[in-house]
Structures are given as structure tokens and as C-alpha cells.
């Protein structure tokens, strides 16, 4: 059967007929038409620390018992806490694992063995994570998972620190001429590091695939503060203006000096907006004036976006040359749910030729808090003339979902209808391609203490909504070490209603 041939099951409809006419019942009835047993990916993101803290077999037991997991996304390389380490310090500890934070021990890095022969074309090899001693998460977990018919996908991100040996050779250069903490896609040392690390994993371990995450956006959106924590972005520190990017820009016919002038003017616009200094013709008109005066602004933005796409393609083809059977794909960040500019750059049809799968973040519980942060930021820059609630309504309209008012969403989160709409939109964006769509599901992603928290029912409804929208699978996110087993159980409840539970 084709992987997108969906089996309509009268049995699933019979199960849900006895449920109350609630959102979950409606989703289960509709999703039953998209539920093909043994064809859906039920994935979970998990870091190395969980296997060390709880024991490999116990963790795998929990995954199967509470969520019917059939695919592991092992966080193998990162210097960030978003996908590795224990619970974020200060957030409530989950109902499993070590009941203490790893504030003094977490280092990040590569949680697998580094084989130097694959890094000959770069000065940067990454560093072996030291917080768990010599523990190799791939060597330990893959054989145990194989015995249970659970697949293993290596999961990594481009989150770095400035104190890593040789990292300066990879770093982006910001508008002010300083090294940034981020690294440049056009830098051969970084590109070759990425190719080296995926070759290392592909040749050294019995993996099923690789998923890479870059939760960054280009200089234009960053300068405008067009993301959930955008108010913290200094517009004079946007990237990248390194020699490699300048050379690439010139090859495209973009004048780097004009681009710098444009971004300096944009930085002044943003700084004045944050100080309440309204332009004579208003914020939106003034922004358009800058874009018309400096078309290099958008040209530089697209240079960055194309460089990311080229990195995707390079990773994809390098892995396929080594082992065509390995799946390769990408994680698209939550900014996709808030910033229309960023969404425009996430052209799924353009990404599909170099993607076996794409995970789209649909983190509904934390989305309310994050959307509120985004609105707070852009209401001081490009949309400074629009009252915040009207601005939110505008975004609901152009992004095609309807959630609660601005004053409420940090405390309610987004509904499962948002997950449904985003899955349907992404499915349509991938129409006619062979790329699998995996919906990223929020399970206890940290929020502020008084803001919305996940629940078993909320997780259940999000999973049901994803399958109603014809997702090829789900990925329970962000990391197991912050998830409550009681909330994870909500995923299994949904899968049972869909007859996808083993």
C-alpha cells in the first residue's frame, strides 16, 4: 500500500461513537479515516541523559507503555538545553528520572563517539560531551531499540557556545563587524563539519535516519524582532556579513555596501520604534520606504535563506551517497506559526526534493505564550501603528487560524484546532511530493509559571488533530526529560481511539 493511502476504519468510528460530542470525539471520528495501522511514525525526542538516569530498558518500556513509540529521535549533538540535558533549571521536575537539575554538570556536545577520519576537511570537530562521561547514546540505545522494532533517527541542531575550541573559525559576523555566537552556512569549515558528522553517524552506527534543526532566521526578520523573543534582539547584531557571505552576495549581483547601509537604516528604524518615536508617515509606510530604497534588504534575506536550503541539500545528498536507505529531513521551528515572513521562506514544495520527511512544529500549548511575545515585539517595529489585539487578529487571518484574544492566550495556549489547521496547510504544501509530514506535538514544553500547562487531554486532542489533518506521523517534543508520564499517556489514549496502539 502507498504510504499515503489511508484506510477508513469503521471500527474506529464505532469506538468514538460512544464518546461525548467533544473536540476529542470529533477529531477521533475524522482522524480514523487517516489512520493506517503500522504505517504511522510515532516518534519521541529524547536526550542521552534520560537513558543514563533511568536505564535504557526502563526508558524504552515507558515509551511503549505510555505512547506506543516506534521511532526514537536521539538528541546526539547540541550545546543547547532545548533538546538535551535534564529539565530546564527552575521548571517543575517531571514524574520520572533524577529529581534534581544538572545545572552544574551539563556541557552539551557530541553524545556519540567522534571518529576523526570524517572531519579532515574542517578545523572544527565538535567536542565530546563530558557531562555523561564516555557514554555513547547511539552505541547503547540502537541495539536495545532494534530488539523492540523501534527505529532510531539521529537528531541534532546548530546550537553552539562561544567557548568551544575553534568555533571562531565558523562564526557569523554581525552588522557591527563582531563575531556572533551563531555559525555561518556559507563557511566551508561549518559546511564540512556538518557533512563530516552526518557521515560519521551514517557509517559508524546502524541508524535509520538523520534529522537536523536550525531554528534561526535571516537578518531582515531578526532586525525587525519578528520572533517570540524578538524584543531582545539588537538590530546592530544581525548576521551574516562574513567574507564568505560577502563573496556570495557579489556573485549574485548584490552590493554588500548597499546592504550594510540598508540594515543600518533598518536598525535605526527599529531602535526609534522601540523608543516610541513614530515616523512621520507611520511605521509600516516607513518600512516600505526603506525596502524600496534598499532592495538589498530582501536580497540579503533571501541569500541567507537560500544558503540554509543549500545546506539542507548538501546534507541530504551526502547521506544518500553513503546509504540511500537512510531517511533525511528537517525540523521547522515555531516561528513558522507566528511570522508570515519566515513562513514565506519555508516553501515546502521547494524543500521537498531534498527531504524525505519534514517535522513542522505545532506546539499548541506554548504557542499562546510565544505568539504573545511575537506580537509584543513587532508591535513596536513594522506594525507599530496597529493596536496589539488588532494586530493579533490580522495574524490569525493571514496565518489561517483563530484562537483566543491576546490577553488570554498566554494562559490558555492554542487549541488543537491550530494543530489541525497547521497539519492540513502543511499537507497541502507538500501535495504532489514524496515527503512525509510529521507533526511536532507539545508535551510539557516549559512556559512561565502562571501560563498554560499541558494536560493529558490536551496532548490527546493534539495527536487526534494531527492525524485528522492527514499527518504521516507525530513527534512528541521537545525532550522526554521535561515530559510528565501522565501527559505522555494522552498520546496513547489518542492512538487507542485511532486503532494505532499496539
Predicted regions span which residues?
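N-terminal export signals
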Residues: 5-26
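Boundary/entry segment of secreted carbohydrate-active catalytic domains
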Residues: 35-54, 444
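Polysaccharide-binding and catalytic clefts of secreted carbohydrate-active enzymes
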Residues: 62, 120, 124-125, 129, ...
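Aromatic-lined carbohydrate-binding/catalytic grooves of carbohydrate-active enzymes
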Residues: 69-130
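Aromatic- and glycine-enriched glycan-recognition loops and surfaces
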Residues: 50-66, 106-143, 307-311, 414-422
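C-terminal segment of N-terminal export signals and the immediately downstream linker at the start
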Residues: 20-43
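Catalytic domains of carbohydrate-active enzymes, especially glycoside hydrolases
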Residues: 58-80, 204-207, 469-473
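Substrate-binding cleft of secreted/luminal carbohydrate-active enzymes
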Residues: 355-369, 412-425, 432-493
